[in-house]
Amino acid sequence: MAALAGFAANSLLCRAALRPGEADAATFTTIRLATGAVTLWLLARGTRAPILGAGSWRGAVALFAYAAPFSFAYLRIGAGVGALLAFGAVQTTMIAWALRSGERPRPAEWAGLALALGGLVVLVSGGLSAPDPAGAALMLAAGTAWGVYSLIGRASVHPPLATTAANFARALLLSAALSAAAALWRPPHLTARGALLAAASGAIASGIGYSLWYAALRGLSATRAAVVQLSVPLFAAAGGVMLLGETITPRLVVAGVAIVGGVAVALASRRDRRPSNPRPAV
């Protein structure tokens, strides 16, 4: 549960820093990746996992393509809505890849996927309570990129901590370039509180949260590991209400039930066919 709370905390910390203007999105992303890289490097060193040669530029690009839109999206949408959008995009991406790879879903899986996609449509469809279109598009892009990153990571032969540490370090270079480019358009903005929130997102919610998740995976089947992640958007929505003063709209409730319920139906019908190494949620 601590690892899952860490994943939800990423949404809350990002929103808490960006909504009141404690940091600009590019700077927040760079600090998050930097502190995450350092934390993961220290954790990997502690396990003596070889970092040199681990990871890949493909993985780093996918990680950056998740982290940057994730931050910019939270300038426009709430924590609960963002987590639901990202979660739906991650699952849709991975299911689409499974179909492309020749996996034949069962009828219940098709029904669950249709229900989850219907929930996404409800969430982003027009109306006064619909999320900002640009913010929703950015978060869907972030979720898709995280799904791609997860698929890339499944093929890694290196220890997960070493792979993630190396990918964070490479993605940091891309984020630094983004920050430099953004500074040409608008001066960077960062308060002490914004820096603290970004560092907490990178070091604790991402670095320590991921390490706890990898440890938990040893005692979970692939299906159970996927099912327990269904609570992450709910944690984020609850945290947004209690800590950030966000409101829960009927649209969010209906969409949340449809998305989480749909994926639960799909996953409950699937039995583990081979060992796998799923990655953590947004």
Predicted features and spans:
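Specific transmembrane alpha-helical segments of multi-pass solute transporters/efflux pumps
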Residues: 6-9, 47-87, 95, 115-116, ...
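Hydrophobic alpha-helical transmembrane segments of multi-pass integral membrane proteins
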Residues: 26-42, 112-115, 134-141, 152-207, ...
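Hydrophobic transmembrane alpha-helices of multi-pass small-molecule transport proteins
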Residues: 40, 63, 105-125, 142, ...
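Specific alpha-helical transmembrane segments that line the substrate/conduction pathway
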Residues: 27-38, 63-64, 71-104, 142, ...
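Glycine-/small-residue-enriched transmembrane alpha-helix faces in small-molecule transporters
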Residues: 1-30, 61, 65-69, 118, ...
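C-terminal-most transmembrane helix of multi-pass membrane proteins
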Residues: 33, 230-282
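Cytoplasmic-side transmembrane-helix entry/capping segments in multi-pass membrane proteins
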Residues: 1, 52-62, 103-116, 136, ...
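Hydrophobic/aromatic residues within transmembrane alpha-helices
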Residues: 17, 28, 32, 73, ...
